[in-house]
């Protein structure tokens, strides 16, 4: 789809969407996004130029269908997939990708740490994906030194980062915000450092007593990202891993650094979004969103959850979707899904489905609350179908049509019940939606009420 679009850009020093937007150019990707979002093309260009919106679109991911992440666009959902040393393989990950796209993932992150050749897995995922692909290059950097963190060098990180860019990765989580001076701030936490990438960098700094190499070589990463139009997803290495640790000094110190790095990337017209927590009580979610906007100059916020309680292993797609809906309402641009397997194991296909649907609900609820154009249209159409007992239309409009039909058909499977004016909840005699009050009847009632006082029986 994008082969012709990007052909004329190849070889230029900077091919980022932000670079073109700041020159006043409306790219084909911006036109495409404007149509998808039902927004003016000028607004898309201006938001990208300002840094409040990103269009993650590596020039080597030519089968990508461009999308936007930003406060002016619909709230988006990311799904994580990835093989581990103990579970999964290439085909399973491609199957998970296809499932994630089927159930509405706007982007997908490949978090593979093992399970085969990581380059082959990543290449297969990018080739198969119409949505932006994100990665965490620190994972493969660690694999390249056989898991010995102390042996990692800045060149190891940069080599893997460029490899991912060359392969077509659209955005990369870069854990450049955790600094050596931040590490003592986690002393009073219950769960310490829960970011895998952050933990790797922390151990490296503790061993070498040197500054984070991703921070000291941040300009080198910018130069790579300019050449391929890779977007930064600035990792929150010190995100809270439990509600006790939320909004603490460590988290906020790193957030301030992430704001500085955001503005540094913008100096070279490189797109940025900023990752956020995590585990946050409901009463602190608005503060966290507002604080990110303040520190990071309104760069798009991308949060994991947040989980609003820590006591529901097996149900963390619910505990986190509650926080995600609130975060989206307050202005978070993208929500990273959490599956029922969070904290327990690697998610399977059914976990991916359940996590995604929970987060599509959260994102859609946020869009309605923020009065985004057309956000409630689908709700209204489904409500009309429900009132008219148009069961097949209800299924069609559902976020998960197969599940809706499956639940209906558990008790009323025959085709005749697809036109029935009841379901198994109320049966044929008690459904209140059978009470159809037409306009003429209401007009007559209004005339009566205007003339006669209502008597109490």
From Swiss-Prot:
Coiled coil: none annotated. Pfam families: ThiC_Rad_SAM. Keywords: 4Fe-4S, Iron, Iron-sulfur, Lyase, Metal-binding, S-adenosyl-L-methionine, Thiamine biosynthesis, Zinc. Zn(2+) binds at residues 279, 343. Catalyzes the synthesis of the hydroxymethylpyrimidine phosphate (HMP-P) moiety of thiamine from aminoimidazole ribotide (AIR) in a radical S-adenosyl-L-methionine (SAM)-dependent reaction. Belongs to the ThiC family. This is Phosphomethylpyrimidine synthase. It comes from Nostoc punctiforme (strain ATCC 29133 / PCC 73102). The lineage of its organism: Bacteria, Bacillati, Cyanobacteriota, Cyanophyceae, Nostocales.
């Amino acid at each position: 789809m994008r082969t012709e679009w990007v052909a004329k850009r190849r070889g230029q020093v900077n091919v980022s969407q932000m670079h073109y937007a700041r020159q006043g150019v409306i790219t084909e990707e911006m036109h495409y996004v404007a149509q998808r979002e039902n927004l003016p093309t000028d607004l898309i260009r201006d938001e990208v130029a300002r840094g409040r919106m990103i269009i993650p679109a590596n020039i080597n991911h030519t089968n990508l269908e461009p999308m936007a992440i930003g406060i002016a666009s619909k709230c988006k959902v990311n799904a994580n997939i990835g093989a581990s040393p103990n579970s999964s393989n290439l085909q399973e990950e491609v199957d998970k990708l296809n499932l994630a796209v089927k159930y509405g993932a706007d982007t997908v992150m490949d978090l593979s740490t093992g399970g085969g050749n990581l380059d082959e897995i990543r290449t297969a995922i990018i080739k198969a994906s119409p949505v932006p692909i994100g990665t965490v290059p620190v994972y493969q950097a660690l694999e390249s030194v056989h898991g010995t963190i102390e042996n990692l060098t800045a060149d190891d990180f940069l080599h893997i980062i460029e490899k991912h860019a060359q392969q077509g990765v659209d955005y990369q989580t870069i854990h450049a915000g955790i600094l050596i001076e931040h590490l003592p701030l986690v002393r009073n936490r219950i769960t310490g450092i829960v970011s895998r990438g952050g933990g790797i960098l922390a151990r490296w700094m503790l061993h070498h007593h040197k500054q984070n190499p991703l921070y000291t070589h941040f300009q080198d990463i910018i130069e790579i990202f300019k050449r391929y139009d890779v977007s930064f997803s600035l990792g929150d290495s010190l995100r809270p891993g439990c509600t006790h640790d939320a909004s603490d000094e460590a988290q906020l110190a790193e957030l301030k650094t992430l704001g500085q790095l955001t503005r540094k990337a913008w100096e070279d017209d490189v797109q940025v979004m900023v990752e956020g927590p995590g585990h946050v009580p409901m009463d602190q979610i608005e503060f966290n969103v507002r604080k990110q906007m303040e520190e990071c100059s309104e760069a798009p916020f991308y949060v994991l959850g947040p989980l609003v309680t820590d006591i529901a292993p097996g149900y963390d797609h619910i505990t986190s979707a509650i926080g995600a809906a609130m975060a989206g309402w307050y202005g978070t641009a993208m929500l990273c899904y959490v599956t029922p397997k969070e904290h327990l194991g690697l998610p399977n296909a059914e976990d991916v489905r359940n996590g995604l649907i929970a987060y599509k609900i959260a994102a859609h609820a946020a869009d309605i609350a923020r009065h985004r154009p057309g956000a409630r249209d689908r709700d209204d159409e489904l409500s009309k179908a429900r009132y008219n007992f148009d069961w097949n239309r209800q299924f069609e409009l559902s976020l998960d049509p197969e599940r809706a039909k499956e639940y209906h058909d558990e008790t009323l499977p025959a085709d005749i019940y697809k036109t029935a004016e009841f379901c198994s909840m109320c049966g044929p005699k008690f459904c209140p939606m059978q009470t159809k009050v037409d306009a003429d009847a209401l007009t007559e009632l209004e005339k009566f009420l205007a003339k006669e006082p209502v008597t109490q029986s």
